[in-house]
Amino acid sequence: AAILRPQLRRLGAQCEAWNSRYQTVEAGLQETPGLSLVPRPAAEKYVGSSIQFLLLDWPPEAVQDVLGRCADRGVELKWFGGAEPSGFTSRYDSWRYAESAPMPKSDRILAGLIDMRIPLTFSLEDCALIARIIRAEVSAVYQAA
């Protein structure tokens, strides 16, 4: 409890800082060909500690190409469409403790779903640069297809 109290006092400011970073990345990714962002309802309250975007109906090889190109430039993205879970990207079909029925509509979305954590150690300038890198690499792979 003693460790948590000071953090609780700063929680509002921390949430605002995350959202500023999220909004910077989001603005930089807007209108990227081949990339979809999930529109957020105006009334929604959220904490943008990560951002998700969609490369809908992309071949797995093209998604992997984007991930590799971004990684080569220092931007680590996580993909929910990989055959095996990586980090926090597990899907329902990789859960070993419960059987599942096929969910083709979910599979289609997960096959193109990309996630990136946004730590508070990133400055707004870092976030703008990261968005430019993602935009450039997605655009390059999309145009080559």
Q: Model-found features: residue ranges?
A:
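Conserved glycine-rich beta-strand-loop-beta hairpin in the small C-terminal domain of fold type I
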Residues: A1-R5, N19-E26, V38-L54
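A non-catalytic, amphipathic alpha-helix used as a structural packing/dimerization or gating element
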Residues: P6, R10-T24, L129, I133
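Generic structural signal for small/hydrophobic residues in well-ordered secondary structure
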Residues: W18, I51, C70-A71, I109, ...
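Short beta-strand-to-loop capping motifs
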Residues: F53-D57, I118
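Short, conserved charged micro-motifs
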Residues: W58-V66, F122-L129
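Short amphipathic alpha-helices in soluble, non-transmembrane regions
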Residues: V63-R73, I130-R135
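Conserved PLP cofactor-binding pocket of PLP-dependent enzymes
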Residues: V66-L113, A144
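Long, positively charged, glycine-interspersed low-complexity recognition regions
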Residues: A98-M103, I109, D115-D126, I130, ...
